[in-house]
């Protein structure tokens, strides 16, 4: 037990000695004093330990006093030093002010750079607050921990450059460290940090100036912004406006003039399969007839006149054509055509012989069947369509209604013969038409514009015309007159040259014959009953009004119309009546008047959607619909064939005789009788002359013609001879020449507005040398938005006279999508809020290619029509209006880009155009 206790006591004492030594070691490290010698393991009493501690503390205090006395000269600042410091601070402040003054005289190019750099603030307190840029945080520190100051103000700082200053250190949030280092800071350190900040600005300024020097041209003129010229910023603003205007103009023109590109076809590089044209073998009984009997036969057939080489003789019976029994059963059984009509008797043998034909015959004479029967023989003789093949027969018409009428006639045969056909026209969904063509259509009936769309759809992969061997132009004169010649020519260039081409119409003016001969090969001309002749089955009547006042004339015409409707309604309750007017607005106004008088009726014209036009014709054609009156423009004068249509009323006289022939030709079809009544005023000398001529050509006796009409006609023709009156024949009043005249008149008006009257005669002379029309230049000129700022209050505003500047921006001619993006509520509200201007929609929207009328009726009075749709921008300052214009122009450019993108993408669906 004793040995154990002694061992424990020894270990305990050693542990205590070690602890004492450790405490002494810590004390020595803290006080940084030498350790007195103490033997290891020696035990000390409390008194000895305390005495030794006191000695160590006294030595440490003495050493601290010596250390504090050595640097005292550095901290003490004498009065002389304080004066020198004040002078130095004053000099530096003066140099800073001088530097600021120089900075204000220089370009504003560094304003953005200066805004990015945080400011350096010196407060009035003893301790400065320093704000530094992020770029100043990373500095290269020399080995001695001090940084060299850069020259700022030139040679006057040479002395300062030789001095070395403490390195500027980033402030921290360590408060203990800040408090510890406060006594070591000096005023020189503050100024040195300011020098560093100013030197940084100087370096940035020199860098910008170097960039400007690099942008100088060889002539020494700076290209960069804000160099040397005060007005250069204005020039840049003008250039930017012009650049935006050019972008807007190019995008608008590109969108307006965008064509359906059809690549030229080199027929020499395509190996076409041969095909058969001649399907007709002249019967023996026809071939044995002498020429005298053939002439007599043509005379009996309404006086058929033929012109050409080796003209085919006419037939007498359907059996002489050698048609298949299936077709014969449809003709004689279903359609109940016992014998061919005059045009059919002469035209069908000629077409089936492989000849190109120009056929002119009166309305309702069976022209459609004349080109349909040979087409069916063409298709039956050729191999079936393969995948990717286009049609074999192509029929082009000027109007949608005529295309539907022909397609309806074709359906009598195609269903029985298992022949596929497709009717393609504008105003309806193109997707369904593309789907039908993808399935394979042996016959296409359509309008030229939609046919070109289909040829260009999907980069030409929808259909092609390589297999077309039979091409028909129905109502060819109207097609050329409506400006379709470029489209028709474009289609013709894509059809094989050895095709068979057939042209039919009820009228055929001489200048149209010249155009037709360009696309025909050795044609045979067939004229039945003369050119522009009303059928003998139609009774022509004229109601002459002697009223001088327009209002009384309108009342008299409407009163006569009501009495006529009552008379024919009493005679035949199922009688269909077609009323023609000249203008779309007149059709709508007459519709309202008749509905007010409790007459059920409908109206069709070019301004209505295709679905509405189709519905109106279907209701009018139906015997159970209760609608027996249809009001129409001349759009219904072609191809409309309605059973029971016994009366045609020209409420407004036709513009020329060919149009009159087609109008009245809607009745008296297929051998049935009909009546045509024309309302005309005694002031309409030209219309009366056409009526008298038409009645004389249709063999109406002079006794049946009103003597007053003959008197007015004779007087008018005498005026034409003397030069007092002008008499235009045929379609020349509405055709391609008239479009050119409209363009020239618009340009003359613009030159007068901008003071260029002197050059008008030269300009006209040069214009006449150019081509008359183009496929996409036939439209009226599109007006580019004008962004001129006008000083003064806009006259069309009714508010107080506060807005000193305004601008009118025409948006009528922009595409619909571009208009929506420009004028939607969000876009305009942003522009108004950011610029402080007022923006208002003014004017009316006028569709493309429409002509603004000189006057319109409003509340029974003739007033000036409103201008095209535009935005009125008003502001208190010119700058506010200019800023609004810039934003609106950007919206227009954005809208044009969206419109172009949507047009290139086409409608949502499987196919694109």
Swiss-Prot record:
Coiled coil, from the record: 192-265
Residues annotated to bind ATP: 361-368
Keywords: ATP-binding, Coiled coil, Helicase, Hydrolase, mRNA processing, mRNA splicing, Nucleotide-binding, Nucleus
Domain Helicase C-terminal: 564-713
Cited CDD domains: DEADc_DDX46 (cd17953), KH-I_PRP5_like (cd22474), SF2_C_DEAD (cd18787)
Compositional bias of kind Polar residues: 1-30, 68-82
GO biological process, one term: RNA splicing
Subcellular location: Nucleus
Basic and acidic residues composition bias: residue spans: 45-55, 84-121, 178-188, 209-219, 765-774
Main location: nucleus
Extent of motif Q motif: 316-345
Reactions the enzyme catalyzes: ATP + H2O = ADP + phosphate + H(+)
GO molecular function: ATP binding; ATP hydrolysis activity; nucleic acid binding; RNA helicase activity
Span list, region Disordered: 1-189, 209-244, 755-774
InterPro entries, sorted: DEAD/DEAH_box_helicase_dom, Helicase_ATP-bd, Helicase_C-like, P-loop_NTPase, RNA-helicase_DEAD-box_CS, RNA_helicase_DEAD_Q_motif
One GO cellular component term: nucleus
Limits of the Helicase ATP-binding domain: 348-526
EC number assigned by the record: 3.6.4.13
Enzyme class: hydrolase
Pfam families for the chain: DEAD (PF00270), Helicase_C (PF00271)
Motif DEAD box location, chain numbering: 474-477
Function: ATP-dependent RNA helicase involved spliceosome assembly and in nuclear splicing. Catalyzes an ATP-dependent conformational change of U2 snRNP. Bridges U1 and U2 snRNPs and enables stable U2 snRNP association with intron RNA.
Family, as annotated: Belongs to the DEAD box helicase family. DDX46/PRP5 subfamily.
Comment, domains: The Q motif is unique to and characteristic of the DEAD box family of RNA helicases and controls ATP binding and hydrolysis.
Protein name, per record: Pre-mRNA-processing ATP-dependent RNA helicase PRP5
Naturally occurring in which organism (per UniProt): Debaryomyces hansenii (strain ATCC 36239 / CBS 767 / BCRC 21394 / JCM 1990 / NBRC 0083 / IGC 2968) (Yeast)
């Amino acid at each position: 037990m004793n040995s154990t206790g002694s061992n424990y006591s020894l270990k305990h004492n050693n542990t205590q000695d070690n602890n004492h030594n450790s405490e002494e070691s810590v004390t020595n490290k803290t006080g940084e004093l030498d350790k007195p010698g103490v033997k290891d393991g020696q035990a000390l009493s409390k008194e000895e330990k305390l005495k030794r501690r006191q000695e160590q503390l006294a030595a440490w205090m003495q050493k601290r006093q010596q250390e504090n006395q050595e640097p005292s000269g550095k901290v003490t600042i004498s009065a002389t030093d304080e004066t020198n410091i004040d002078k130095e601070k004053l000099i530096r402040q003066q140099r800073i002010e001088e530097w600021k003054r120089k900075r204000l005289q220089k370009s504003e190019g560094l304003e953005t750079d200066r805004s990015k750099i945080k400011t350096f603030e010196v407060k009035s307190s003893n301790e400065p607050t320093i704000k530094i840029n992020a770029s100043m945080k990373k500095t290269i520190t020399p080995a001695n921990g001090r940084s060299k100051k850069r020259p700022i103000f030139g040679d006057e700082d040479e002395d300062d450059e030789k001095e070395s200053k403490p390195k500027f250190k980033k402030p921290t949030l360590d408060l203990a460290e800040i408090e510890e280092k406060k006594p070591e800071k000096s005023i020189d350190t503050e100024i040195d940090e300011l020098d560093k900040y100013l030197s940084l600005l100087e370096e940035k300024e020199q860098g910008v100036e170097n960039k400007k020097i690099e942008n100088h041209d060889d002539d020494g003129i700076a290209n960069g912004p804000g160099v040397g010229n005060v007005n250069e910023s204005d020039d840049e603003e003008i250039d930017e406006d012009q650049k935006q205007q050019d972008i807007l103009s190019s995008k608008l023109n590109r969108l307006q003039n965008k064509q359906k590109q059809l690549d030229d076809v080199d027929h020499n590089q395509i190996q076409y399969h041969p095909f058969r044209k001649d399907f007709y073998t002249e019967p023996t009984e026809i071939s044995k007839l002498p020429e005298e009997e053939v002439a007599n036969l043509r005379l009996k057939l309404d006086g058929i006149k033929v012109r050409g080489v080796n003209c085919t003789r006419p037939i007498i019976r359907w059996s002489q054509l050698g048609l298949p029994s299936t077709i014969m059963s449809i003709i004689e059984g279903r359609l109940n055509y016992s014998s061919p009509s005059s045009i059919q008797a002469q035209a069908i043998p000629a077409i089936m012989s492989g000849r190109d034909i120009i056929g002119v015959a009166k309305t309702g004479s069976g022209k459609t069947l004349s080109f349909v029967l040979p087409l069916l023989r063409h298709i039956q003789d050729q191999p079936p369509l393969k995948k990717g093949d286009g049609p074999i027969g192509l029929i082009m018409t000027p109007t949608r209604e005529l295309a539907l009428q022909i397609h309806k006639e074709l359906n009598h045969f195609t269903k029985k013969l298992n022949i596929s056909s497709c009717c393609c026209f504008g105003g309806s969904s193109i997707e369904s038409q593309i789907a039908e063509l993808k399935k394979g259509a042996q016959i296409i009936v359509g309008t030229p514009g939609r046919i070109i769309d289909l040829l260009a759809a999907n980069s030409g992969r929808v259909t092609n015309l390589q297999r077309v061997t039979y091409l028909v132009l129905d109502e060819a004169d109207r097609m050329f007159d409506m400006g379709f010649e470029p489209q028709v020519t474009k289609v013709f260039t894509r059809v094989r040259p050895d095709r068979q081409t057939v042209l039919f119409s009820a009228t055929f003016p001489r200048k149209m014959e010249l155009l037709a001969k360009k696309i025909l090969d050795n044609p045979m001309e067939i004229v039945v009953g003369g050119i522009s002749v009303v059928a003998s089955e139609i009774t022509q009547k004229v109601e002459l009004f002697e009223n001088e006042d327009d209002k009384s004339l309108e009342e008299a015409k409407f009163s006569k119309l009501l009495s006529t409707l009552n008379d024919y309604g009493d005679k035949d309750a199922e009688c269909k009546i077609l009323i023609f007017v000249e203008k779309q607005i007149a059709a709508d106004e007459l519709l309202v008047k008749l509905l007010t008088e409790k007459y059920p009726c409908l109206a069709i014209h070019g301004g209505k959607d295709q679905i509405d036009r189709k519905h109106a014709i279907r209701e009018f054609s139906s015997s159970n619909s209760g609608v027996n009156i249809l009001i129409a423009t001349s759009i219904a004068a072609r191809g409309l064939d309605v059973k029971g249509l016994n009366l045609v009323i020209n409420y407004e006289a036709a513009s020329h005789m060919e149009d009159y022939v087609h109008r009245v030709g809607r009745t008296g079809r297929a051998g049935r009788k009909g009546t045509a009544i024309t309302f005309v005023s005694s002031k309409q000398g030209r219309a009366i002359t056409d009526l008298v001529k038409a009645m004389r050509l249709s063999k109406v006796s002079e006794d049946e013609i009103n003597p007053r009409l003959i008197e007015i006609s004779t007087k008018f023709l005498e005026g034409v001879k003397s030069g007092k009156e002008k008499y235009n024949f045929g379609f020349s009043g509405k055709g391609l020449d008239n479009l050119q005249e409209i363009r020239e008149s618009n340009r003359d008006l613009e030159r007068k507005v901008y003071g260029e009257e002197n050059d008008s005669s030269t300009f006209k002379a040069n214009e006449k040398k150019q081509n008359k029309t183009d496929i996409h230049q036939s439209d009226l000129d599109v007006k580019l938005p004008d962004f001129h700022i006008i000083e003064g209050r806009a006259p069309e505003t009714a508010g107080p006279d506060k807005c000193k500047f305004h601008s009118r921006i025409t948006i009528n001619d922009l595409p619909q999508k571009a208009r929506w993006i420009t004028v939607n509520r969000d876009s305009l509200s942003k522009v108004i809020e950011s610029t402080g201007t007022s923006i208002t929609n003014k004017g009316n929207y006028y569709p493309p290619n429409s002509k603004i009328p000189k006057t319109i009726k409003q509340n029974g009075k003739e007033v000036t029509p409103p201008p095209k749709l535009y935005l009125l921008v008003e502001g208190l300052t010119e700058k506010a209006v200019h800023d609004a214009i810039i934003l609106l122009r950007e919206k227009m450019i954005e809208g044009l880009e969206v419109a172009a993108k949507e047009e290139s993408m086409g409608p949502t669906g499987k196919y694109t155009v």
